């Protein structure tokens, strides 16, 4: 099956570019073709797209994360000579930095998910380091925490990316829903953005409602609003308006909803500001 999407307003276009970049990084561009302003997508491109999305985010933004900062401390800690006069001060500096990162709210929520599959407790280790006198033991325990972070890169690195990059553009749904912040990030993305597409494409859609972006019919129960998009969307259920004659028409089909989730990869982000040339 093939999906066709046309270039539209700047934000949707940035989402299309972001979607393209996900497929590019996943080496799936063979499933995409172009005809003037139309992007044609083979639905095979959506298989395991949730994993492709997460990996694209990691590849694009990993270098600018607290996770990366912590990981880069590994060689520094390993090279501290405990016989040096400054050794204790150096270890204390690295300890404070890693402790600060681990005690952030986003990392604590990540731990709540990870502890279901990994019984190592980094917070217990942090307390042990605080009480430890032996410098070699302090080093070893710090390196244990870094090894733990490396094992769970997808969770911790993505936590940084979610709150410093993705949240610039959208919020309150999927893994940014306040009730899902302790859940598996990949599965939350799949559940909110991909499973509705499978259901939508599996049946013949006939409806009085049409998607505001692609114009395809979409049932009210299968549609999505735009309130989750930062500074753009309006929650039509909470705010009626004479502007649309009290009948909301800002409705998205599941496919276009997915495209908007890719907006953070369509922009170039510098100093918490997004840049996109339409």
Regions found by a protein language model. Give the residues of each.
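Hydrophobic, Leu/Ile/Phe/Ala-enriched alpha-helical segments that form helix-helix packing faces
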Residues: 197-201, 214, 218, 260, ...
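A broad, low-specificity signal marking well-ordered, structured residues that form hydrophobic/aromatic
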Residues: 200, 209-211, 251, 275
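General "foldedness" signal
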Residues: 24, 225, 266-270
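Domain-exit/linker segments immediately C-terminal to small folded modules
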Residues: 233-278
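N-terminal start-of-chain detector that recognizes signal peptides
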Residues: 181-184, 223-226, 248
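N-terminal alpha-helical interaction blocks
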Residues: 1-209
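Short cysteine-rich clusters marking metal-coordination/redox-active sites
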Residues: 211-215, 253-256
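Short recognition patches in nucleic-acid-associated and regulatory proteins
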Residues: 207-208, 215-243
